[in-house]
UniProtKB/Swiss-Prot annotation:
This is Codesane. Several analogs have been synthesized to study the effect on cationicity, hydrophobicity, alpha-helicity, amphipathicity, antibacterial, antifungal and hemolytic activities. Belongs to the xylopin-like family. GO terms for biological process: defense response to bacterium; defense response to fungus; innate immune response; killing of cells of another organism. It comes from Colletes daviesanus (Plasterer bee).
Length: 18
């Protein structure tokens, strides 16, 4: 679902921001 998709994408976004 949406939550699992966010859980997958969020760490990558955080890496990009960092």
């Amino acid at each position: 679902g949406m939550a699992s998709l966010l859980a997958k994408v969020l760490p990558h976004v955080v890496k990009l921001i960092k």
